[in-house]
């Protein structure tokens, strides 16, 4: 059977035969309980005897760690030309003296305060360094630890830019037209920095999209993209039952290559013991029951399955929180979620993943590392839950997206109405049918199997139907031609988030070698 044969003898539903990867770093029962290798045991110790210490069953529910702030180093480059008789002694630019530079530094500080107040992502601005000579970069406060340089290129030599690039720093190149004294490099950034006195761009890790003129909003979305990327690269994710890929066994390997993901495996035998330990803990069970009761009292919530399935889903949620605390991460995915986990947990993982996402974790079904990296990246950029889903076939500007694990706080705050039902394909357990809001603009990512091309599509939710498919269902309307979308669709699973983050995704992906094909 070929790698991409999905006919019925290959279990043709949204989760076909799993291709669990044994290449990812695994957590054996012993190492899991004692601490993950490579991390200090004292900070990672997780023994099942003191379950309440780890699982938070003293009433304090575990919460995910926050995103790491993007550290931004502002650097002002300028020159102080000296007047000379009967010759051209000064270049373009409104900053010509030390007094001009001091005033510009004060202006930059005001702008950084504006950016900080506007940012919906964690960012730390380091002290401004103003230089006339590349040698002044040596020992500049915070430069070595900075993730990104915000270069205010008022004037001065081009060597500063090259020096920053040689250090491997992402550089946002800011020049002024009318937002302050005009910049010299507003004139010559293209022919000198980008094209190196030629007709074609010569820079490899810096292009036209890295240059901003005047607009702080343009700086802000670039910083948002870089914050999301920094929180994605080398991040850790727990894979229950191993890492896999929808019809593509190399997906975990490719995810590691592109995003340096640290995939930690928890085997199903180990999970079975964790569930057994949690069920034996009366406080853990009581907390799960209390949470189930509170969840069902949320406005717009109706129960259409057995209450016990919801309580078991909450207990599984608490176990997964403890697993992620042990692994010191905020991301988890489940392999064989449409079979193996059901008799073990006596529910489905659908509602569990939904509640985890609502509380700020990144929780995905199917352990499909074709699409999981896109969810991690989009969530880290937007700071909101995302919805892994199955697409259908586009027609007349419309496509249906569906799955059984939809978050209820897709905007990060508002709890949307939901019917708590069974998982569709098993008619078992607890799964939310979230009524995602009509009129909402969504960013949709279509990752390719080869991890070299992702397609982007904006859509508007026009309906939340109730078809005989996965419970969470949305019809989205899009602007591009339906046939063109059908011809350009790669991979299988999509990732969807509220809002338009198409620019941020393209800006981030070019840094990891993935083509962003945005269809509008």
Where are these regions (language model features)?
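Functionally engaged cysteine thiol sites
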Residues: 2-3, 7-21, 336-339, 345-352, ...
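N-terminal export signals
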Residues: 2-26, 31-55
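Conserved, well-structured core segments that form the ligand-binding/active-site neighborhood
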Residues: 35-36, 189-381
